[in-house]
Amino acid sequence: ENIRFDLREEQNDETFSKSISELGDLYVNEAFSVCHREHASIVGIPIFLDSYAGLNLEKEIENLNKVKEEPERPLVILISGVKEDKLKMVEPLSLIADKVLVGGRLPDLMGDKALESVRLAPDTQKVIVGNLIMDKEDITLNTVDRFVSEILKAKTIVLAGVLGRFEDEGHSQGTQKVFQAVASSKAFKVVGGGD
């Protein structure tokens, strides 16, 4: 079913890893989005089996390296969602991107210290921090227009996270319109989900 239903998965339990490894002859990791986790299915099983990166995992790494090393410009990175730890990426990303768009709940999570780090970014014109509607569950229409304008100029786009509580129809407009702009763009795109 789902390996995460078993507590031993997240504990990276060695006995659990060994028992799962006995079900196969080799291990192929296709799960780029969880490679950072120290779970049994990611780092435990490979101890007991010959292990390989799958073709999809290799392609995702190749695409990220392309963005990092030789992006076609302008490069626009949209960082959004609800995880505050994403904020620490704004400044480093501003060193490689032509524009960094900050959306989702992140503008609301930016305390004075986080805002100061954005202000200290090498070229603050590169960083566009979105505005939120009154209940803070979506970005404003002005922010949508500004983000879409930057996206339509881009030759490379990296998108990480949603812009509002998109599962609620009343708060899905920002995500829908910005994602439609990304989808219709002819730019090279790397899209990651999550919050």
Model-derived segments and their meaning:
Residues N2-D195:
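Active-site loop-to-helix "anion-binding N-cap" substructures in soluble metabolic enzymes
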